[in-house]
Structures are given as C-alpha cells and as structure tokens.
C-alpha cells in the first residue's frame, strides 16, 4: 500500500513540476504560443495527421515565429523568412547544433553531416565541402547523363509495351544511381541487394518525420532508446549495406588516386578507430539517404503537376523544344535558356517543399531575435510548408503558378534547401539532377492521367514530404 502511495505521489509531483516548467515566465520578451497541457505540451493540437499544416494554421494566430511545446521540448516554429535569415545567417553560430534525441542517437550516434553538432560538425562540413571541390565533376556528370539515358530508355519500353509509368519507383532508382556513382564511383545494379533498400529508406524517412512521443518526453528517453535499438530493422539494413561497401572500398583504396567521395573521406578520417569508421559510414549514410529521397520525391511531384495542369505542361514542352532546336537531348548548359522550365521546378519546390520542417536545430545560448527572446537549448523548426504558404511573400500561395518565379528578383521566402552555414551541402547537385531528368522526360513524353481525373495532391508527412498515394500516369512519346 505504501509503495502505491509513493508511486501516486511521484506521478502527481511529476505532473505538477511538468506543468510549472511549461507555464513559468522565462523572459519579458518571451514568445507567445498556444496553451500547453501537462506532459503532452501542445501535441494535442496536431490532429490532422499532417503536422506541418497544423503548425501553419497556428501561425495564422501567432505569426511567423511562435512557441510550441513538443511534449517536454520548448520549440520555436518559424515561417518568416526575415527572422529565419536573422537566425541562421546573421546569428548562425548560435544555431548550428542538433537536438539529442533517442531516434537520432540510434540512427547515427550523432555522427555524420546531418545530425552532429559543435566542433565535430564543423570539421565534417569542411571535409565535405573540400570533397565537393575535389571530386571529378566531369566523371559524375557524365554518369548523370547516362542515368538520364537509362531513365528515358526504361520509359520508352514502358510506352511501347502500352504500360503505365510509376514515377516513384523509377525516380527513386534514378536518384539512387546518381548518388551511388558520386559516393562509390560505381554503376548501380538494381538486380542485386540495393533494390531491397528502397523500402527501408522510405520507411526511415517516414518514421523520422512522423516522430515519436517518447523522443520528446524526457522521462521516457532511456527506455525508448533501448527499445528502438532492439526493434528497428530498417536502419540496420541500410547501415550494414554501407559498412559492407566501405570495407570493400578500403581493400582497393589508393591514397594517390581519388576515385570518389568515399576515397576522400577515407583519406581525411581513416585511422582504423571505430569512431572514425562510424564517422565515415554515418556521413555517406546521410548523403545517400538525403540525396536519394528528397530529389526523387520532388521529381514525382513535378510529374503530378504536369498531369494536373496540362496547359502548363505544354508551355514547358514548347520552351524546351525550342531550346534544343532539333537535338534529342537537353543538356545542363541549356538551363540558362529555359526560364519557364526553371520556374516550374522552383514552383514545385515551393508548392510541395522537399521537407516539412527539416532536421531541427537547437540554440547554444539565450539570444534575442528581432525583439523575441529565445532560450538556450530551444528546439528550432523551420516550417517550410508554412513558409511556402506565407501570403506576405507569395500571392495566392495555394495556387500552382510557375510564372511567379519569372520575375528576376529573388523571392526571399524561397528557401527549399534551408539557408546559412548549415544549409543543404548537395543542393547544387540536386538541382542539376532534377533539371536534367525533368527536362529530358518532358522533351520525350507527354504525361496524362490514366482515368481522366486529377491526381490527389495530398502529401504524406515525414522528413521528406512525399505524395500520400503512389500513382501511375500514361505516357505518350513526343519524339
């Protein structure tokens, strides 16, 4: 009986203390936000199954910066581009770190480029930037051209056989092959075990994006970490594959010959220690996953937009056809002559951002942004979806209209790859691979709905915003 009383007392004490933490005033300029409840904080307000939309709706009341309790985590939600720049550009040194939560610890042990922090991350970033400069870009882009040819060849066969085209699977293979060449300097073979990674990669992004209450509930973190360590099957599949590739690569490594990104990482990091090996594997894991998933999801949305807006599809096709002037292939050098096509790609990235809220950051000290107080260790979210729907910067944001980007003035709210020191290191490569794939498939094929109806544009929440439902389209050869 006494034991039960003790348990009851501890529960009541925990609830009271938890409530006090959430309601205590921390500064006269503290952020406003919705009213939290004990334990859950404001999570009870994420009811639609699409948290990025719920957060956007809340911003209608509290503006482009507000406070939101993800259970025990004090979180700042941003959808104002001026404040985002003030944080990540003007005060970027205070917003470099990542939060330490069980799911990220399980995935990377805070190693690699995406989830590490502090001096360790600065060193990784410098090495990656150096690698980007030293990599044989001609070899990489020649391979990218070949991957485009392979994609067109597959689509030609689908069209000639009278089959429907499934964008998700073919774009996933295209982006995966591009990253594979960049990291390992190898052509991918989808008849082997690599094809078995497509499902786990999708699930990892879905799980990380949807999150878990136990990640943000401090009292549950130790047990939750142990639980996912013993139950998750997806990350181990991916990491075991990358470990195998790493050890195979090491056998043929020659410090005098730099074949690819992995060679450069080995040269900079390899000492034989377990920690350095983990750093290398975690880094190629980050680049492989991010470089595969976000670009393929964006290409999938581009096809959706072509089908749902056929008049826009024809405008893009007419511009590309005029630009190539009889050639049967679009080159990267043609991009400067295709402003409407580039605007279409930008509008797709705005309308359906590659990421919902991205990977959160944390503050390393108390700081004033604008006139608002941000406490140390606050979790920082950019709501990319809310940013893309900000009516102060985008007229009629719910409409898909590529012409909005035809204005040469850069829209400061267009930040699909984040901004500042910790922006996406592979954004230029991602834009190049998307342009080459998109421009060439539309030069070669006309896309249409298989049933005459528009494709459902609803997205599935995750680290990557992907179409909720896989869809097929009809393709008809143009040339």
UniProtKB/Swiss-Prot annotation:
Its EC number is 1.14.-.-. InterPro entries: Cyt_P450, Cyt_P450_CS, Cyt_P450_E_grp-I, Cyt_P450_sf. It comes from the Eukaryota. Pfam families: p450 (PF00067). Heme binds at residue 424. Keywords: Heme, Iron, Membrane, Metal-binding, Monooxygenase, Oxidoreductase, Transmembrane, Transmembrane helix. Its cofactor is heme. It is a single-pass membrane protein. The chain crosses the membrane at residues 1-21. PROSITE patterns: CYTOCHROME_P450. One of its GO terms (cellular component) is membrane. Its main location: membrane. It is found in: Membrane. One of its GO terms (molecular function) is oxidoreductase activity, acting on paired donors, with incorporation or reduction of molecular oxygen. Belongs to the cytochrome P450 family. This is Probable cytochrome P450 508A3. The gene is cyp508A3-1.
């Amino acid at each position: 009986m006494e034991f039960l009383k003790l348990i009851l007392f501890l529960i009541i004490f925990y609830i009271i203390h938890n409530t006090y933490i959430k309601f205590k005033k921390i500064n006269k300029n503290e952020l406003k936000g919705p009213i939290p409840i004990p334990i859950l904080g404001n999570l009870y307000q994420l009811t639609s199954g699409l948290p990025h939309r719920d957060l956007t709706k809340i911003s209608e009341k509290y503006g482009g910066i507000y406070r939101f309790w993800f259970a025990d985590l004090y979180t700042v939600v941003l959808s104002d581009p001026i404040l985002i720049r003030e944080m990540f550009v003007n005060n970027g040194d205070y917003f470099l770190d990542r939060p330490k939560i069980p799911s990220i610890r399980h995935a990377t042990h805070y190693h690699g480029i995406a989830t590490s922090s502090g001096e360790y991350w600065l060193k990784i970033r410098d090495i990656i930037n150096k690698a980007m400069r030293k990599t044989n870009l001609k070899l990489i882009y020649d391979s990218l051209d070949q991957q485009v040819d392979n994609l067109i060849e597959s689509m030609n066969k689908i069209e000639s056989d009278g089959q429907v085209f499934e964008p998700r699977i073919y774009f996933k293979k295209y982006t995966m092959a591009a990253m594979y060449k960049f990291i390992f300097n190898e052509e991918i073979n989808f008849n082997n075990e690599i094809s078995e990674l497509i499902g786990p990669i999708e699930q990892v992004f879905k799980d990380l994006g949807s999150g878990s209450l136990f990640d943000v509930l401090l009292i549950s973190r130790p047990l939750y970490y142990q639980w996912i360590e013993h139950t998750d099957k997806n990350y181990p599949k991916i990491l075991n594959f990358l470990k195998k590739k790493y050890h195979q690569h090491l056998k043929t490594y020659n410090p005098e010959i730099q074949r690819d990104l992995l060679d450069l990482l080995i040269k900079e990091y390899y000492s034989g220690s377990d920690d350095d090996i983990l750093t290398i594997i975690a880094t190629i894991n980050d680049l492989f996953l991010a470089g595969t998933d976000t670009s393929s999801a964006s290409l999938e949305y581009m096809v959706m937009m072509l089908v749902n807006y056929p008049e826009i599809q024809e405008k893009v096709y007419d511009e590309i056809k005029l630009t190539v002037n009889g050639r049967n292939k679009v080159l990267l050098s043609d991009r400067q002559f295709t402003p409407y096509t580039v605007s279409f790609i930008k509008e797709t990235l705005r309308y359906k951002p590659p990421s919902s809220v991205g990977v959160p950051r944390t503050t390393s000290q108390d700081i004033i942004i604008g006139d608002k107080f941000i406490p140390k260790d606050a979790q920082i979210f950019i709501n990319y979806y809310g940013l893309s729907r900000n009516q102060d910067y985008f007229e009629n944001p719910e409409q898909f209209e590529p012409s909005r980007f035809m204005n040469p003035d850069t829209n400061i709210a267009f930040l699909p790859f984040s901004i500042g020191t910790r922006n996406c290191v592979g954004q230029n490569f991602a834009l190049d691979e998307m342009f080459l794939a998109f421009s060439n498939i539309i030069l070669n094929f006309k896309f249409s709905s298989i049933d005459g109806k528009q494709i459902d544009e609803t997205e599935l929440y995750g680290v990557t915003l992907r179409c909720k439902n896989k869809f097929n389209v009809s393709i008809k050869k143009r040339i």
